[in-house]
Regions:
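Hydrophobic N-terminal alpha-helices or hydrophobic patches in metabolic proteins across all domains
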Residues: 1-167
Length: 167
């Protein structure tokens, strides 16, 4: 990536999909993990912040608010604007909410969580509250939303963990 200070999101799952793709670092490709059992779709593009390691040992998860869905494998320069706090059966699993830095007419002026309609934040929160409901042995506990400053902390922690692991 050209700018080491720029954040990039790698999209695993496009907005509107029920398919859950995950990046497999051993294969170097995205793999279809499963189709969601519930009749819900991802409310935003979903993936991870490149060159980070989250508290769960995986790259830091993110959602990218886009006017139109992209595609699995798309890399988007992003700005973080908040964090959705949650845990799943594996532990802490926070999601950084981002906007694209690509001239998106809908999200170009968003720079903090307060710039997002409360109804959309509720929709995203509801999705993560129920999206695993029908999967045996899977569960989520949702917290709430945090602001841009908290997102910056989560990403700094994730970048430091990645740097430490990379040696």
């Amino acid at each position: 990536m050209p700018d080491s200070n720029q954040l990039y999101a790698l999209v695993e799952i496009p907005k509107g999909s029920r398919n859950k793709y995950e990046y497999d670092p051993d294969l170097g490709h995205l793999v279809l993990d499963r189709t969601l059992w519930t009749s819900v779709v991802y409310p935003a593009d979903y993936g991870f912040i490149v060159d980070t390691i989250g508290r769960d040992g995986d790259p830091v998860d993110c959602l990218v608010l886009v006017a139109e869905p992209t595609f699995p494998g798309c890399v988007i320069p992003v700005e973080p604007i908040g964090v959705f706090e949650m845990t799943d059966e594996k532990g802490e699993d926070d999601k950084v909410l981002c906007v694209p830095l690509t001239g998106d007419p809908e999200w170009g002026e968003a720079h903090d969580i307060a710039d997002v309609r409360p109804a959309l934040l509720d929709e995203i929160g509801h999705f993560f509250d129920i999206y695993k409901d029908l999967e045996h042995g899977a569960d989520t506990v949702v917290g709430g939303w945090h602001d841009r400053a908290y997102a910056d902390e989560v990403i700094a922690e994730g970048r430091a963990a990645f740097t430490a692991a990379s040696g």
